Amino acid sequence: MATTRLLAIAVASGRVGSVFMIGDTLTYWQVSVKAAESPVEAAAHAQTLINGFWPDVIVTEEPNAVRHKGAETLALIAAMARVAEDCDLLDVQVPRVQRFPNKYAEAEALALRYPELAPWKPHKRRFYQAEPRNTVLFEALALADFMLNNRGE
């Protein structure tokens, strides 16, 4: 059986995070601010990633299960999912399951499983600070991890 090439993309306010995995091995990760500017930029970003990595599967957040994202963010997710569909790729939309008390605990657990991302682990913020830029990277990794751990269910 061939090893699955998986591209997971997450969108947060003003940022798009993506991770690329071959099997269970994390090989690439990126945070883009430009991709979050508009659905056109998001689609172009997704197309660039697809052209560069040739994934078998693209994982995005399931829009119907999202309660905490605005209309602009949902439009970005939809634009990237359309690109996957246009490229005849399997676009798996998974719910963003929060298995930890907060994003920082989740990032800590994911950094233990994928130590190559440990330097990008976001630190807990104070209430008056903006959300750390790299949280979206760990959201993308959580989507990929959810997909990998729930195959065949």
Predicted feature locations:
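Phosphate- and other anionic-substrate recognition elements at nucleic-acid/protein interfaces
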Residues: 1-153
